[in-house]
């Protein structure tokens, strides 16, 4: 918005997977996974839908999949490769791949994304990761994964999400930010408070 100086990047939400194998204390996505198994048909439907969006050329970001840390299920699921291939062929559309709290990215490094896939991490300080976000990658693991993706040419975004006021969170967050800038150069930073749906 011009009057506030804030930047808002609206995006279409793409979902083919709900559920998460992580066990973050604040999250309700765990325990049961709901999966589209006809992922090839789903990706073809997305491609056909692009023509309907020609009247909104400024709307060119598609986020997949906030309902799960989707890369945890890859490459076996197969959706990431199909979507990266699809978006790499688009002149003006971009996929935001929600890597979330994972460090599982080695399968992504050789994909031909042509700069049309953005990798987005949720980053939290180490004490929060250890105490509140069970089964997730460590802060350092996420930063290493983000660096690998950035070195493979992927644009990288970071969400400080959620900000949970654990004991020592201020010092932990300062350290996290210093480590982040020492390892990567994120193109966008987002701060999200703890929230419940």
Q: What is each stretch, according to the model?
A:
Residues 1-17, 30-39:
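N-terminal [4Fe-4S]-dependent radical SAM core
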Residues 21, 56, 182-183:
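Alpha-helix termination/capping residues and helix-transition junctions
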Residues 142-197:
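Conserved C-terminal portion of the radical SAM core fold
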Residues 28, 88, 150:
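Gly/Ala-rich phosphate-binding loop of Rossmann-like dinucleotide-binding domains
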Residues 10-17, 73, 132-139, 163-167:
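Short, charged/polar micro-motifs that form catalytic or ligand-binding hotspots
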Residues 20-27:
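Short cysteine clusters
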Residues 31-144, 155-159, 188-192:
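Core AdoMet radical
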Residues 19, 79, 171-172:
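Short, glycine/acidic-rich beta->alpha junctions
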């Amino acid at each position: 918005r011009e009057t506030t100086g804030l930047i808002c990047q609206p995006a279409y939400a793409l979902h083919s997977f709900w559920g998460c194998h992580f066990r973050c204390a604040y999250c309700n996505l765990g325990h049961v996974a709901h999966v589209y198994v006809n992922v090839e048909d789903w990706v073809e439907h997305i491609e056909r839908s692009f023509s309907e969006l020609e009247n909104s050329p400024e709307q060119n970001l598609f986020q997949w999949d906030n309902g799960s840390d989707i890369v945890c299920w890859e490459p076996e699921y197969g959706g990431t490769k199909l979507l990266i291939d699809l978006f790499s062929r688009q002149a003006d559309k971009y996929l935001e791949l929600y890597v979330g709290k994972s460090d599982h990215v080695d399968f992504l490094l050789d994909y031909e994304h042509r700069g049309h896939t953005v990798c987005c991490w949720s980053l939290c300080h180490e004490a929060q990761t250890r105490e509140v976000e069970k089964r997730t990658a460590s802060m350092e693991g996420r930063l290493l994964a983000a660096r690998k993706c950035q070195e493979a040419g992927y644009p990288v975004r970071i969400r400080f999400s959620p900000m949970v006021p654990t004991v020592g969170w201020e010092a932990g967050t300062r350290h996290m930010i210093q480590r982040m800038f020492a390892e990567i150069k994120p193109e966008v930073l987002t701060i999200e408070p703890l929230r419940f749906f």
